[in-house]
UniProtKB/Swiss-Prot annotation:
It comes from Shewanella baltica (strain OS155 / ATCC BAA-1091). GO terms for biological process: rRNA processing. Binds 1 zinc ion. It holds the Pfam family YbeY. This is Endoribonuclease YbeY. Single strand-specific metallo-endoribonuclease involved in late-stage 70S ribosome quality control and in maturation of the 3' terminus of the 16S rRNA. Belongs to the endoribonuclease YbeY family. GO terms for molecular function: metalloendopeptidase activity; RNA endonuclease activity; zinc ion binding. The keyword Cytoplasm applies. Its cofactor is Zn(2+). InterPro entries: MetalPrtase_cat_dom_sf_prd (IPR023091), YbeY (IPR002036), YbeY_CS (IPR020549). SUPFAM superfamilies: Metalloproteases ('zincins'), catalytic domain.
Length: 153
């Protein structure tokens, strides 16, 4: 079974390097895997101002962040393939990649996989949940040809 993904990519900022639409689709499809037959996903690339505003509004943290996940929750009697939205701050991803000595491509892939797993219900608040999520992220990222995103550089 393969995933039928409808992907909407919104560019609300500019930056030095962005993944291609094909890369975004590959990373999202890999993360979603066989969880759904079809899915609709929006990835919005934003600046630090928009990221900070959303992070403050929805998480109470007054600073920009790398990725925010907004899952779509339909009423129980309605079945829709809407997975949700990812909001990724390009400047934060670039800074983190540089600080963590990762390639931009590898860190963008990690942010898309990480965000998609949140949309699927994974979380990292509790230690046990964090271990499960990080293990799955590592498996998916390594399957894409990148190194373990949690391994110390």
């Amino acid at each position: 079974m393969s995933l039928d993904l409808a992907l909407d990519i919104q560019h609300a900022t500019t930056c030095d390097w962005l993944p291609t639409d094909e890369q975004f689709a590959l990373w999202a499809t890999t993360a979603i895997g066989n969880s759904m037959d079809e899915a609709e996903l929006t990835i919005r690339i934003v600046d630090t101002r928009e990221s900070q505003m959303l992070n403050s509004t929805y998480r109470g943290k007054d600073k920009p962040t790398n990725v925010l996940s907004f899952p779509f929750e339909a009423p129980p009697e309605i079945e829709l393939p809407l997975l949700g939205d990812l909001v990724i701050c390009a400047a934060v991803v670039e800074n983190e990649a540089r600080e963590q000595q990762k390639t931009l491509e590898a860190h963008w892939a990690h942010m898309v996989v990480h965000g998609c797993l949140h949309l699927l219900g994974y979380d990292h608040i509790e230690d046990e949940e964090a271990e499960e999520m990080e293990s799955l992220e590592t498996q998916l990222i390594e399957g894409l040809g990148f190194t373990d995103p949690y391994k110390e550089q």
